[in-house]
A protein has these predicted regions:
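N-terminal [4Fe-4S]-dependent radical SAM core
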Residues: 1-100
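Auxiliary Fe-S-binding modules of radical SAM enzymes
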Residues: 1-27, 36-38, 230, 238-331
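Long, charge-rich boundary regions
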Residues: 87-120
Length: 331
């Protein structure tokens, strides 16, 4: 990692502005597209293999019926209409013409290519679109789907968002993920090899049942070895109507405290490659469904806490990153 100091930053982290000590998504958007972009959540009505019985039933224990698409329109609304509505709403917060359609809800490659192709290609024709983001699972990337993603990556800035959550198979089984870490790495490597222009964003959850800080950071270390283009760090939310809510209400799950979460995020950032974009350092649970932790509603406070902790420790993203000499999954 370079130790060249960014002008006025007071620390040697290069991929940031405004004094940030990690590679923010906002910085990447400005560097890539020349300014802010609105990411438009969409629900295309797909299912998941751990919902329909292919590798399990009921989905992940923390997942609502919307499959991480709680902020998208209902799937019954046509995709273009979803896009236009959400674009109008987000324009009040981020007045920008640049937009990235985000196929977010559930597993968005869990269908034949004949179904996927027209959906994704149509999205590229919508007004203001400068890129495309597709959320899926690494075990839902057959060869013909990867070939389609490679085609799309030649036409636009494509981000494929892969849910991993944990590198520990015991935890993955407990939360009903329906795949192992080896499954994830196999899918990741094939995507990296066959669609080299596609950006890969890996999703991780901190605070999963049975995991302490050491276990969480071991997941981050393993992911850092893969050198993904982007990472999202999520706080585990307890949402009404989920299996996790039942566990929580029965006293079988204790959510992270804010200070614990901030400390874990700081240590996670230190382990990640400095070039990796940190697309999220916390998440949003639908307010009406959030049971715990209630402190997570104060998102700005959490973000400020992370910035303050990094500054207090005089540390930054990648400070403790140790690259492997060789790794078949690297670019």
């Amino acid at each position: 990692m370079s130790t060249q100091k960014q002008r006025g930053s007071g620390h040697p982290f290069r991929f940031a502005d405004g004094g940030k000590r990690y590679h923010t998504y906002d910085y990447w958007l400005k560097s890539t597209f020349g300014g802010k972009c609105a990411k438009i959540p969409l629900d295309a009505g797909f299912s998941c293999p751990n919902l329909d019985g292919t590798c399990g039933h009921g989905g992940c224990i923390y997942c609502s019926g919307r499959g991480s698409g709680d902020f998208a329109e209902e799937a019954t609304v046509p995709l273009r209409e979803q896009y236009d509505r959400q674009r109008e709403i987000l324009a009040e917060k981020w007045p920008t013409e640049r937009c990235i359609p985000y196929f977010q809800a559930r597993t968005n490659t869990y269908a034949p290519v004949a179904v996927l192709r027209p959906l994704f290609e149509e999205a590229l024709t919508w007004p203001g679109v400068v890129g495309l983001s597709i959320a899926t699972r690494a075990d839902c990337l057959p060869d013909d789907t990867v070939a389609l993603l490679s085609e799309l990556s030649e036409k636009t800035v494509l981000t494929v968002e892969l849910g991993l959550q944990t590198a520990h198979d015991e935890t993955a089984a407990a939360i009903n993920r329906g795949h192992t870490y080896a499954d994830f790495v196999e899918g990741y490597a094939r995507l990296r090899s066959a669609a080299p222009k596609a950006l890969i964003c890996v999703h991780l959850i901190l605070g999963l049942p049975g995991e302490d800080e050491a276990a969480m950071l071991e997941t981050v270390r393993r992911v850092a070895e893969l050198r993904p283009d982007q990472v999202k760090l999520h706080l585990l939310h307890v949402l009404r109507g989920t299996a996790l809510a039942e566990l929580y209400e029965a006293g079988g799950y204790l959510p992270m405290e804010k200070d614990e979460y901030v400390a874990a995020v700081v240590k996670a950032l230190e382990l990640l490659p400095p070039e990796t974009v940190v697309a999220r350092v916390t998440g949003d649970g639908a307010a009406e469904d959030l049971l715990a932790p209630l402190w997570s509603r104060r998102k700005r406070e959490v973000l400020n806490g992370i910035d303050m902790a990094l500054a207090a420790l005089d540390t930054w993203q990648g400070r403790k990153y140790q690259p492997l000499v060789t790794n078949e999954t690297n670019r």
